[in-house]
């Protein structure tokens, strides 16, 4: 069931992020076959800035999520492809996020590739269309100029704002990064919406 949802919503995620697929969407049965046979399924997309984003969906029992050496080789070979990579998104079963050997590889690859965003997330962030969940208030990234205008008007510094993690589901779907600002519209009893600004901070993983 998780794989069926992942297959559906990962493409909605790519569309929501305004990315363009670089290959045709494959049928679901081929997606499952590739996850089972190779241990992962890869989607390549291009951002509005013409950067490349590669999304890897890893099988829960594949070698890449159990053996750090295999994960290191895969990521190293990927980043050596000489493409203009902007981001790698690794999607794994939640227990993998507690595996020190895998997380150490992520830290290592980030240090070796400081200009490329490398993130690892659990399946459940992509098993639902987060922006369409009615219980979640609307989130929107704002520009640095808009944020500075707000801070100046309120006599605030970024550190004075309440924070939101880069791994918060709406932020993940928006593509927000540490140092960015997000505007959140919450229901209000005195107005249609109460607007708050949050400062995005580095996630724990």
Swiss-Prot record:
GO terms for cellular component: DNA-directed RNA polymerase complex; host cell cytoplasm; virion component. Its main location: host cell. Gene3D superfamilies: RPB5-like RNA polymerase subunit (3.90.940.20). GO terms for molecular function: DNA binding; DNA-directed RNA polymerase activity. The keyword Endoplasmic reticulum does not apply. It is found in: Host cytoplasm; Virion. Pfam families: RNA_pol_Rpb5_C (PF01191). Keywords: DNA-directed RNA polymerase, Host cytoplasm, Transcription, Viral transcription, Virion. InterPro entries: Arch_Rpo5/euc_Rpb5, RNA_pol_subH/Rpb5_C, RPB5-like_sf. GO terms for biological process: transcription by RNA polymerase II; transcription elongation by RNA polymerase I; tRNA transcription by RNA polymerase III; viral transcription. Belongs to the archaeal RpoH/eukaryotic RPB5 RNA polymerase subunit family. Component of the DNA-directed RNA polymerase (RNAP) that catalyzes the transcription in the cytoplasm of viral DNA into RNA using the four ribonucleoside triphosphates as substrates. Part of the viral DNA-directed RNA polymerase that consists of 8 polII-like subunits (RPB1, RPB2, RPB3, RPB5, RPB6, RPB7, RPB9, RPB10), a capping enzyme and a termination factor. This is DNA-directed RNA polymerase RPB5 homolog. It comes from African swine fever virus (isolate Tick/South Africa/Pretoriuskop Pr4/1996) (ASFV).
């Amino acid at each position: 069931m998780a794989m069926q949802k992942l297959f559906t919503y990962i493409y909605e995620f790519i569309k929501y992020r305004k990315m363009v697929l670089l290959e045709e969407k494959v049928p679901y049965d081929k997606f499952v076959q590739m996850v089972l046979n190779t241990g992962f399924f890869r989607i390549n997309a291009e951002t509005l800035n013409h950067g490349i984003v590669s999304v890897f969906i890893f099988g829960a029992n594949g070698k890449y999520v159990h053996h750090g050496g295999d994960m290191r080789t895969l990521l190293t070979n990927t980043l050596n492809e000489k493409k203009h990579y902007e981001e790698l998104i690794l999607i794994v079963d939640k227990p993998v996020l507690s595996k020190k050997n895998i997380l150490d590889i992520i830290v290592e690859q980030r240090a070796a590739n400081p200009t490329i965003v490398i993130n690892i997330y659990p399946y459940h962030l992509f098993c639902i269309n987060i922006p369409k969940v009615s219980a979640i208030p609307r989130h929107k990234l704002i520009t640095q100029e808009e944020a500075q205008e707000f801070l100046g008007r309120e006599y605030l510094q970024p550190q004075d704002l309440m924070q939101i993690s880069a791994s918060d589901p709406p932020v993940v779907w928006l593509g927000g990064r540490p140092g960015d600002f997000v505007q959140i519209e919450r229901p209000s009893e005195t107005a249609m919406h109460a607007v708050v600004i949050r400062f995005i901070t580095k996630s724990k993983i």
